[in-house]
Amino acid sequence: MFEYLPELMKGLHTSLTLTVASLIVALILALIFTIILTLKTPVLVWLVRGYITLFTGTPLLVQIFLIYYGPGQFPTLQEYPALWHLLSEPWLCALIALSLNSAAYTTQLFYGAIRAIPEGQWQSCSALGMSKKDTLAILLPYAFKRSLSSYSNEVVLVFKSTSLAYTITLMEVMGYSQLLYGRTYDVMVFGAAGIIYLVVNGLLTLMMRLIERKALAFERRN
């Protein structure tokens, strides 16, 4: 089993870069959507809620397939070579699917953290004459720090979800596993892949715990 590890490690860079890029895009989107939900912006609130329902209510694999194969159903897109090339790129399609999926769950996580802030803190800011936007600027960082423990699960989940990218020909860890299995028909290839995922997930969890510990250091000092 361990003799397969060097070959499988060739796909680890793709898995990690896809994870990091997806998390960055998802964080930016989740921040925007969380602010919209908190400010209760008309129309936009319903659009965000519809988006969350769509991406949390359907399987990630279906989303990947629709984003990768869907544009092929619109022949007019082929009239724009640059756009067609981008939409035919497996890495970009996987990035879009993972980002949109993760952003939906992260928005729920962050919005839940904001709603968990004691009412007294909102009232204190209001008593100081602060607008809701100014209040958010103060309370949002606190809410995000409080949600780090749960967000670490999302980080691990995104990395594990990159294993689905092989279904659209992206050669990450699982892609190389399928390639090796096709050559050897040795099921232990997947055992070796499991070891890689287990080790990386353990390191990601440890990293998030350290970040959480540092971010919440002020609570221990108090």
Swiss-Prot record:
Function: Part of the ABC transporter complex ArtPIQMJ involved in arginine transport. Probably responsible for the translocation of the substrate across the membrane.
Name under which the protein is recorded: Arginine ABC transporter permease protein ArtM
Organism, as annotated: Escherichia coli (strain K12)
Chief localization: membrane
Classification via PROSITE patterns: ABC_TM1 (PS50928)
Record key words, sorted: Amino-acid transport, Cell inner membrane, Cell membrane, Membrane, Transmembrane, Transmembrane helix, Transport
Transmembrane spans: 16-36, 50-70, 80-100, 155-175, 187-207
Pfam families linked: BPD_transp_1
InterPro entries: AA_ABC_transptr_permease_3TM, ArtM/GltK/GlnP/TcyL/YhdX-like, MetI-like, MetI-like_sf
Domain ABC transmembrane type-1: 12-208
UniProt topological domain (Cytoplasmic) ranges: 37-49, 101-154, 208-222
Subcellular location field: Cell inner membrane
Membrane topology: Multi-pass membrane protein
GO CC aspect terms: ATP-binding cassette (ABC) transporter complex, substrate-binding subunit-containing; membrane; plasma membrane
Similarity section: Belongs to the binding-protein-dependent transport system permease family. HisMQ subfamily.
